[in-house]
Each structure stands twice: as C-alpha cells, then as structure tokens.
Amino acid sequence: MNNFFFRPVAPQSASPYSVRVPTRFTVLGSGSAGNASFLETDQTRLLIDAGLSGRQIRLRLAQMGRSPETLDGILLTHEHTDHTQGLKALCAKLEIPVYCNRLTADELRFRMETKLDVRQFVTGQSFEIGDVTVENFSVPHDAQDPVGFHVRTADGGVGVLTDLGQATRLVLERVRGVSALFIEANYDLNLLQEDTRRPWAIKQRIMSRHGHLANSSTAEAVENLANGTLRNIVLGHLSRDCNTPEIAKEAVAEKLLQAGIDSLRIDVSTQANPTETITL
C-alpha cells in the first residue's frame, strides 16, 4: 500500500510574523544515534533531518518556544534511521511537508506505514520554501542518494554537510559563501584504528570515500572555506566511541590557527542537548 502523497516542489505560503525574525540556526542534537537541526527565518521554519525521536524533537523545539505544528517543512539529507526515525511520530497527525529526492522517498516508502506528504525534489535542482531557497547537491555516502544543503536566506546562507566520506572540491564549492556551516566530524583516526570493538571491515567502510569524515578531513574542509563570509562552524555526527567534543574541536581549531585564521566561532553538537542558537 502506498502511503505517500507525491507533490512537485513549489513555494509554500509564508507564515506571518508581526515582527521580523532574523535567520537563526540550531542543531537540536547530533551523533551516531540521531540528527536533527532547526532553521528559522522571518517567514519559514524548517527541520533539517528528523533523526531524534519525535518526543525529543518536540521537547527541544519547546525549549526555543517552538513546536512541530509551526514547521513549514522537513528537509531530509538521506534515508538512514539516524536522520529519519522521528518522521513517524511527527507526521502521524501533522501534515508537515517532507522534502526529499526520489530514491530517498522510495526507500522510506518500504519502511514506513505513516502517510507522508512528500514534496519530491530533483537532486541538484534548487527550490523554494517560503522566503528561503534550498540548494541541494550530491555527497559521497553509502545511502541511496544522499545530499547536502545550502539554504539561502535574506540574512545569509546555512550549509549542512553530515554523513559524507569525502569533502570533495565540488561539495565545498556548493557551500562556499555560507555564513554558518554544520559539518560532520565523525571520528579521530587514531581512536578508530585502535578500537577493538569494530571489525576491520567496518573500519574500512567508515574510512572509505562513502563513509564518514575524520576530524582531520573536516579541519581541512573548514580551512578551505574560511576565507569569506563564514563565521560559525558547528561540528556534528561525532562517534560515541572514536571521538570526543574536545578532540574534534581541537583538531579544527589547531588547523585554523596554523593558517592564521582566528575569526571563526566553533561549536560542537552532541546527542544530549541542542547547541547554542546561531543568529545570522
């Protein structure tokens, strides 16, 4: 049984606010068990991935005085459970549009019984939701058709790069010019190699081009993007066993220091709590 509504992506009606709200971005939680972030502009409120439980997403939005009922859409990077497990709870009663590409939608259709209002986009083609333009682009990862996002707003851009094995030149160019970047820093190479609980085959997958970013690779990517409009970095998707917030932040900060760059704010997202909100 097909429980999906398929509609072409189109601009959504604006949500009226009495006072203009500057663009704000918060990572609600990020890690191996679940990932979700929240972006709010003057007219639009978006959830980017829904990998936390529906209850946790609701609780963490409530901390900011928001609720799922006010969302204008949910953007999905890919179909893996740590990015989608909250969809069922959020969409069971609320008709929140879910934006994803065809292969991601196809995969979700086989796994979910909940009826979803899917707004299918074509990978590589931008679209609008309210007052934002969403650019999406392919990233290397072991999913059906994983993407990153560059969300353009009146106040600047927000880039989302989670779950990718390599920050290619093409990927970096797609987020160049953002004001804030949420980027994966999954593992410390030494800790992963010394981990006795993971089979070598799993380690190879993690370190592969379609796996996850090491701290050192993340640091190089951030250095590459640092000369320009970039002001805020949020490191995410840290491994519970092969990384720590301190190690990840130090790796990026040291790389920037060596390059003589000291103008960036670096935050690290965790599974347990939202990050401090970034205002563009």
Predicted regions and their residues:
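C-terminal regulatory/interaction regions
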Residues: N2-V9, S13-S18, E246-L280
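Conserved beta-strand hairpin/beta-sheet module of binuclear metal-dependent hydrolase folds
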Residues: F4-F6, Q12-M64, V147-D163, A180
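Active-site metal-binding loops of divalent metal-dependent hydrolases
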Residues: G29-S30, A50-L52, E79, V139-D142, ...
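Active-site environment of divalent metal-dependent phosphoester hydrolases
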Residues: A33, T81-T84, A105-E107, A143-Q144, ...
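Active-site neighborhood of phospho(di)ester-bond hydrolases with catalytic His/Asp-centered motifs
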Residues: I48-G51, L71-E79, Y99-R102, G159-T162, ...
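Active-site metal-binding motif and surrounding structural segment of the metallo-beta-lactamase
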Residues: G54-C100, S179
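Metallo-beta-lactamase
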Residues: N101-G156
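Cap/insert and terminal regions of metallo-dependent hydrolase folds
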Residues: R169-T270
